[in-house]
Amino acid sequence: KITIGNSVLFGPHVFIITGNHQVNQIGKCIIDVEKKTERCDADVVIEDDVWIGAGTIILKGVRIGRGSVIGAGSIVTKDTQPYSINAGNPCRKIRMRFTDSEIEEHEKRLRP
C-alpha cells in the first residue's frame, strides 16, 4: 500500500516500489516462484509537505518524513527524518531544511 499525504510534490519519473521477489527458493527459477513471503512486501508512506525530485526510486517499507526534500535521482532505502534534505544512492541526509525553532514556527503557520 502507498499512502501519500497532503501538499506533496512529485517530479517526473518517480517510482515507488512496495514489493520484491523471493529469490532464495532452491530448485526454482525466480520467475517460477509463486509464493511470496510477508517480508517481500512493505508499505510506503509519504507524509505531508514533501518534495520528491525527478527520477527518484523509493523502495518498500520507507517512510518519507513530513517536510522532507528528496533530491533528483535518489534511491531511498530508509526512512527520512522530518524536514530533512536528502539525496544520493543510497539516499542520505544532506542537511535540515530548518532549525528546530523554524520548524516550530513553520508548523504553527501551516496549522493555525
Predicted regions and their residues:
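C-terminal/domain-terminus segments
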Residues: 58-87, 91, 102-105
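Flexible, glycine/small-residue-enriched loop-and-beta-strand segment within the central core
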Residues: 1-60, 89, 95-98
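Short, basic/aromatic-enriched C-terminal tail that caps enzymatic domains
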Residues: 94-112
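Short, highly charged low-complexity linear segments
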Residues: 27-29, 71-73, 106-112
